[in-house]
Amino acid sequence: MNSFAVFGNPIRHSKSAEIYALFAHEIGISKEYNLKLAVQDNFNYLLHNFFKLGGLGANITSPFKENAYFLCNQLTERAEKARSVNTIKKLKNGTLLGDNTDGIGFISDLKRLNWLDNNNQIISNDAPIPMVTNILLIGAGGAAKGIVPILLTTITTCHINIVNRTFSRAQELTSYYQEIGYKNISCLPLYKLRYDTNKYSLIINATTSNIHNTIPKIPYFLITPDTKCYDLFYTKQDTLFITWCKKNGANYCADGLGMLVGQAAHSFLLWHNTFPTINPVIDHLRSAFYM
């Protein structure tokens, strides 16, 4: 088989195969990359069978990143910390190495957007510059797990506040990161945001709300003209979350297409030991949306 694939549900909308093809063309290789629709009952079987039949590498997307974590024989440090896997490589001895490139892909996109300065601090037009950079993270699933560790280690002045529709999941995630040494992280029941007096420099939607045609229920007053609003999801037009943020005064908004390409580039690096060019692929996908 000697192929690559992405596993998820839904999967029809995925741009991963197109991204891989563009990267592969750049460095002059030719490999198959397929979309694999799975459900919870057959994900483990499909993944193992893919590698048994000669698969070399796989991307894992929602909702299977946490499942994949437990199926790998070895884990990179960032996958271990995230307890979530979005990239798997079959090693020469036949074992599976799990990695999580979501976090590094997210940080690379913040830099591409010029939202981070040379010291990896979020750029602010406010004066004075806040001593603590407050980040609101909406969601506590696999996508959120992938970005928390690198946010805390890269943006050294940040404090992350996690909210989630099911508060117990936010508590579990917060407790885990506190136990492994990250102190600048807390959580809050979603309804208590109406009493929150923090000024957030960055608000991240790490939920799948757009798939369900909804937006996270957060108060409009958390949005200021200087707030950076990022939706890990991406669509042809603005996501519902970004539309809502703009309506409430946000001047800095981005969807997750740049992060998608960034994390895919780091997956490609793991598989082929070559780092592809990111920006032309983002530009190509953006233009293709409107053709």
UniProtKB/Swiss-Prot annotation:
Function in brief: Involved in the biosynthesis of the chorismate, which leads to the biosynthesis of aromatic amino acids. Catalyzes the reversible NADPH linked reduction of 3-dehydroshikimate (DHSA) to yield shikimate (SA).
UniProt cross-references to Pfam families, sorted A to Z: Shikimate_DH, Shikimate_dh_N
Catalytic activity: shikimate + NADP(+) = 3-dehydroshikimate + NADPH + H(+)
This protein's GO CC annotations: cytosol
Record's keyword annotation contains Oxidoreductase: yes
Residues at which shikimate binds: 14-16, 61, 86, 102, 234
Annotated metabolic or biological route of this protein: Metabolic intermediate biosynthesis; chorismate biosynthesis; chorismate from D-erythrose 4-phosphate and phosphoenolpyruvate: step 4/7
Source species: Blochmanniella pennsylvanica (strain BPEN)
Keyword rRNA-binding (UniProt): no
Keywords: Amino-acid biosynthesis, Aromatic amino acid biosynthesis, NADP, Oxidoreductase
Binding-site residues for NADP(+), renumbered to this chain: 77, 139-143, 164-169, 232, 256
Designated name of the protein: Shikimate dehydrogenase (NADP(+))
The protein's Enzyme Commission number: 1.1.1.25
GO MF annotation list: NADP binding; shikimate 3-dehydrogenase (NADP+) activity
GO biological process: amino acid biosynthetic process; aromatic amino acid family biosynthetic process; chorismate biosynthetic process; shikimate metabolic process
Family in the record: Belongs to the shikimate dehydrogenase family.
Highest rank taxon of the organism: Bacteria
Subunit structure, as described in the record: Homodimer.
Active site: 65 (proton acceptor)
